[in-house]
């Protein structure tokens, strides 16, 4: 059964209950951590999700997140067209984070890098160096 074959409207409550997720209160919002990696296990990005963005992700098969700075749900790629198609979902042992294996179109980082984790930190100085190339 594929992600788009799920009747989200009818089954969302049951799905979330069965997943035994623990949304944490952050800035008066019930959120959990969402980590996106590609099929090669490269970390692409991390963001927050609320229940509605999780529901939209499961319903559409495309990643939706909750922006704490903009206080709204956004679909990855809604402006850049660099969408993330959900392939698999894993939860962590505490149930307060989800790991999504995604098919990334284009780059994941809004700065034009494949990963948001492109700043390597020198543990002796705390200075960071950009690794990798910007993608056009």
Curated annotation (Swiss-Prot):
GO CC entries: cytoplasm
Activity profile over pH: Optimum pH is 7.5.
GO terms, molecular function: magnesium ion binding; phosphoribosyl-AMP cyclohydrolase activity; zinc ion binding
UniProt xrefs under Pfam families: PRA-CH
Essential cofactor(s): Mg(2+); Zn(2+)
Amino acids binding Zn(2+): 93, 109, 116
InterPro entries found in the cross-reference section: PRA-CH, PRib_AMP_CycHydrolase_dom, PRib_AMP_CycHydrolase_sf
SUPFAM superfamilies in the cross-refs: HisI-like
Enzyme class, first EC level, given as a word: hydrolase
Catalyzed reaction equations: 1-(5-phospho-beta-D-ribosyl)-5'-AMP + H2O = 1-(5-phospho-beta-D-ribosyl)-5-[(5-phospho-beta-D-ribosylamino)methylideneamino]imidazole-4-carboxamide
The keyword Hydrolase appears for this protein: yes
Gene Ontology biological-process annotations: L-histidine biosynthetic process
Keywords, ordered alphabetically: Amino-acid biosynthesis, Cytoplasm, Histidine biosynthesis, Hydrolase, Magnesium, Metal-binding, Zinc
Regulation: Reversibly inhibited by EDTA and free zinc ions. Enzyme is inactivated by dialysis against 1,10-phenanthroline, which is a zinc specific chelator.
Family recorded in the similarity comment: Belongs to the PRA-CH family.
Subunit comment: Homodimer.
Role: Catalyzes the hydrolysis of the adenine ring of phosphoribosyl-AMP.
HAMAP family: HisI
PANTHER family cross-referenced by the UniProt entry: HISTIDINE BIOSYNTHESIS BIFUNCTIONAL PROTEIN (PTHR42945), HISTIDINE BIOSYNTHESIS BIFUNCTIONAL PROTEIN HIS7 (PTHR42945:SF1)
Name of the protein this chain belongs to: Phosphoribosyl-AMP cyclohydrolase
Gene name for this UniProt entry: hisI
């Amino acid at each position: 059964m594929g992600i788009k074959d799920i009747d989200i409207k009818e089954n969302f409550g049951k799905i979330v209950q069965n997943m035994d997720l623990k949304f944490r209160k952050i800035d008066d919002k019930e959120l959990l951590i969402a980590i996106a990696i590609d099929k090669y296990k490269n970390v692409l990005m991390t963001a927050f999700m609320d229940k509605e963005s999780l529901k939209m992700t499961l319903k559409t098969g495309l990643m939706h997140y909750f922006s704490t700075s903009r206080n709204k749900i956004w679909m990855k790629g809604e402006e850049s067209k660099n969408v993330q198609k959900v392939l698999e979902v894993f939860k962590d042992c505490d149930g307060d984070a989800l790991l999504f294996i995604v098919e990334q179109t284009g780059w994941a980082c809004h700065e034009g890098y494949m990963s948001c984790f492109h700043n390597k930190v020198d543990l002796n100085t705390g200075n960071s160096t950009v690794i990798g190339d910007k993608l056009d």
